Structures are given as C-alpha cells and as structure tokens.
Regions:
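N-terminal signal-anchor transmembrane alpha helix
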Residues: 1-22
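Membrane-interface loop-to-helix entry segments
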Residues: 42-55, 98-112
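Hydrophobic alpha-helical segments of small multi-pass membrane proteins
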Residues: 80-88, 104-117, 135-139
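Membrane-interface helix caps and helix-loop-helix hairpins in membrane proteins
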Residues: 69-71, 92-101, 122-126, 149-153
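Terminal transmembrane helical module of multi-pass membrane proteins
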Residues: 123-153
C-alpha cells in the first residue's frame, strides 16, 4: 500500500509539471503587455525555484507515503491533489481566458491547501517540513503576485 501511495504522489507531481507546462506561457504577447508589479522576482528566480519545488514535492510525497500512517498519507495526498488542482486552475485562468481575478483566488486556495501539507511534512520529519517551507512561501508570494496583477490590469 505504501508503494502505491508513493506512486500516486509522484503522479500528482507529474500532473502538476505537465499541466503547468501546457498552460503557463510568459513569452506570449499578451503577457508582455501586462503591467507587472514592481516587486516581481526576476525570471531567473522562477527557473531556480520551480525545479526545486517539483523535486521536493515528489520527495515529500514518497517520504510521507513511506513513513506516515496510511490515513495520514491519504490526507496529505488529498490536500496535495486539491492544491495542484487549484494551482493548475490558476495557470489556465491566468494564461488562457486571462481571468486574472479568478486566477488569484485559485492561488489563494493553493496557499490554504498547502498549509496542512506542510504540517504533515513537519510531523513526519522536521527536515522534510523545513524542505517544504520554500514551496509554501513561494505559493504565498505567487498568490500575492497574482492578486497584484489582477489589480494592475
């Protein structure tokens, strides 16, 4: 059962990676015409943080599946899947129909859903919880960034 749950966790990460790749497009003309927040991180930061986030999410899913009780793992994976659904809703709403306000709300959902994930990670392993904190912080920054985009545009 633990191996199956680990595979499900990895599948959620792959869904996140593939979905993000399908919808996020910062190179198109529409995105370039947006008024960007003055505090937006430079593109290089995105190139560093996202690979880290995807890797640590995979490590967290496998570690929790292997070390935590089955019920705890199922709770973690449920919050993880829902948070990814919200994050992908953001990507779609922001870059396809350009619904910036709804996109920002979707990221707020991601932020809220990652809180119990981080708590479970800390309860499983202090080191794992610490390693997952950058993701929690990043989605909070992203939600604020998305909200600011919706206000400016």
């Amino acid at each position: 059962m633990k191996n199956l749950l680990a595979v499900i966790g990895i599948a959620i990460v792959f869904t996140y990676v593939i979905g993000s790749g399908l919808w996020v497009n910062t190179g198109d003309n529409w995105y370039r015409t947006l008024n960007a927040p003055s505090w937006q991180p430079p593109p290089a930061i995105f190139g560093i943080i996202w690979p880290y986030n995807f890797i640590i999410l995979g490590i967290a899913a496998v570690t929790i599946a292997q070390r935590a009780a089955t019920t705890t793992t199922l709770i973690y994976l449920t919050f993880f899947a829902l948070s990814v659904a919200c994050a992908l809703t953001w990507a779609f709403q922001f870059y396809r129909p350009h619904n910036l306000s709804f996109a920002a709300l979707a990221l707020v959902g991601t932020v809220l859903l990652t809180i119990p994930m981080t708590v479970i990670a800390f309860r499983t392993s202090i080191g794992l919880g610490v390693a997952l904190l950058p993701y929690q912080i990043w989605v909070a920054i992203a939600a604020n960034l998305s909200y600011t985009y919706s206000r400016l545009n």
